[in-house]
C-alpha cells in the first residue's frame, strides 16, 4: 500500500505477537541454532544467542516503532529517507535477499518431508516445493488477514514440533545435551552472535511491513523485540 495503515485496520497485541512469531519461526534460523550447537560449548552457545538475539531484537524493535508510528511500509520509509530514486537500492537488496530466503525456506520444508513420506519418489520434492510456495505467496497476496490465520495455525504447531524434537533428542541421544556441549569446536562467541544476527537481519529490516498494523507503538516494539529475541 502507498498509504499509511488506517486506525480501523490495526491489530491487537496478541494478533501482532502471533504474526511476528510466525515471521521469525523460520527454518534457516533453526539451522543456525544447529550450527551453533555444533561449534560452541554450552556457555558460548548461550552467550552467542543472548548477544545476537539482543542486538537483533533492539534493531528490529526500533524499526517496528517507526513502522507503527508512521503506518508506512519499509519501502515508503526508504523513500522518506533516501528519496524516490535513492530508495531503489535498499528496496532491491531486501527484495533480492527475501526471494533467496523464500527458496531456502520452501526447500528446507520440502526435502525432509519428502524423505519422510515418500523417500523413493523424487517427484514429491518439486511438488512440495510448489505447494509450499503457493501457500506462502498466497498468504502474502491476501494480506494481513491471511497472515493472521496462518500464524495462529503454524506458531503452535512449530512450537510443539520444536519441544517434541528436543525431548526426542534427549531421550534417544547417547549422551546428555550438557555432555554434547562440553567442548567447543573452535567457533567464537562473536562469530556465533554474527550468525544469529545474519540469519535474520535482512528479514528484520522489513519489520515495518508488519509492525505498521499494530495499534500502538508499544505493542509493536514489545511483540517485535520478544519475537526476534526468541
Segments and roles (model prediction):
Residues 1-43, 187-193, 212-222:
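Membrane-interface "cap" regions at the ends of multi-pass membrane proteins
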Residues 5, 9-13, 142-152, 202-230:
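Hydrophobic, small-residue-rich membrane helices and short re-entrant helix-turn-helix hairpins
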Residues 28, 54-59, 94-103, 157-168, ...:
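Selective recognition of specific alpha-helical transmembrane segments in multi-pass small-molecule
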Residues 29-33, 71, 175, 197-220:
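Juxtamembrane interface elements at the cytosolic ends of transmembrane helices
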Residues 34-39, 64-65, 89, 108-119, ...:
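Membrane-water interface regions at transmembrane-helix termini and the short interhelical loops
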Residues 35-64, 86-88, 228-229:
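Extracellular loop-to-transmembrane helix junctions
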Residues 49-82, 91-97:
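Juxtamembrane transmembrane-helix boundary signature
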Residues 140, 156-182, 192, 197-200:
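Hydrophobic alpha-helical segments and their helix-loop junctions in multi-pass secondary transporters
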